[in-house]
Structures are given as structure tokens and as C-alpha cells.
Amino acid sequence: RINGAEWDGYRYGMNYDSWVRMVDFASEQGFAYLVLDANWYGPEFEKNSDPVTGEKAKDVQRIIKYGKEKGVGIWLYLNDVAGTNYPIEETLKQYEEWGAAGVKYGFMNGNSQQKNEKTRQITELCAKHHLLINFHDYPVHPYGQERTWPNAVTREYCKAQLDGHQTFEPKTFVTSVFVNMIAGPIDMNNGF
């Protein structure tokens, strides 16, 4: 998340010009993807934040097109509030039509059984609509899902320490990652 960050005399925001700078940087560095994180479609935990027609939907479509021209795929953040309050399949179909590369799905609610079922459903729908998927913020544990669904590239199973403002000690951090990766790929970031 770079919203509000300053670098090289430029203050980044949740806007098209900042996204262009990020795509240009990603392209120059050979990065395949860039994620438009939380709040691009409105305040992420408000039920009326529409993940298809939200605040910056037109700019998102423009940056996806620009990213393709630069060889950078754009992933779109989508959380469980929007995924539950708006038709998930229609949303993912729209992202496919826009040309998005993938979805970072966050803050899934429910008990373990509900989360497992929702993980399977969303992964299958993303595959149907040619989208990669990364489950973020307390998803179900890795279980080899990517064997059936190769579009399920990772999940943040080891807690978003950056968001939680917590840290693991180095030994615990490394051990946790490698033990959990036995079952499948994960992403993890240490906090502060």
C-alpha cells in the first residue's frame, strides 16, 4: 500500500496518475503483476462500496489497459463485504471483461467449514473467469488446492503482520513460513 507515501518528490494516492507511475516502475523492473489494494472501489468495509461501479471503476479499467500495454497484469482487491453483498460471479465476470489478471480476496468471514466452501467456490469461479486468486487476511490453511486449481497461487495464511502491527522473531517467522508451505504456497510479511 503506497497511498500517502512520498518518493522522489511525488506523493502517491489512490488515483490513476499514481497507478501509472507504479505500472511504469513495475514494467521497468520486470514485475509481472501489480495489485490495486483496498479502497479502490470505496471504503472497503462499507456495504454500499460497489466492487464493479465503485468510485474508481473507470480509472481501474484504464489502468488495466495501460498495464497490458506495459506487460504488467493488474490484480484487484475484493473483500468479503463486497463479495457477499454483491453477486460474486457477476463481479468476477466483470473483472475478466476488464482484463484483470487476478483477485486478492480479503477478510473472509465464517466458521472453518463456511470458509473452506467459500474458498473452493471463489477459486472455481476465478478459474472460470480466467483470474488468478490470492486469499488474504485469515484464509483457510493451504491444502494443495493449486493442484486442482492452478489459478490459486497463494494465500496469506500466516497473518497480515503488517496490518496487525505485530512481529515474529526471525526463527519463528522463518519456521512458520516453511512449515505452512509444506501444504501449499503462502505469502507472509513481517510487521513493525
Question: Which residues make up each language-model segment?
Answer:
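An acidic-aromatic substrate-binding cleft motif
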Residues: R1-V20, D24, Q29
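Short loop/turn motifs at secondary-structure junctions
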Residues: Q29-F31, G99
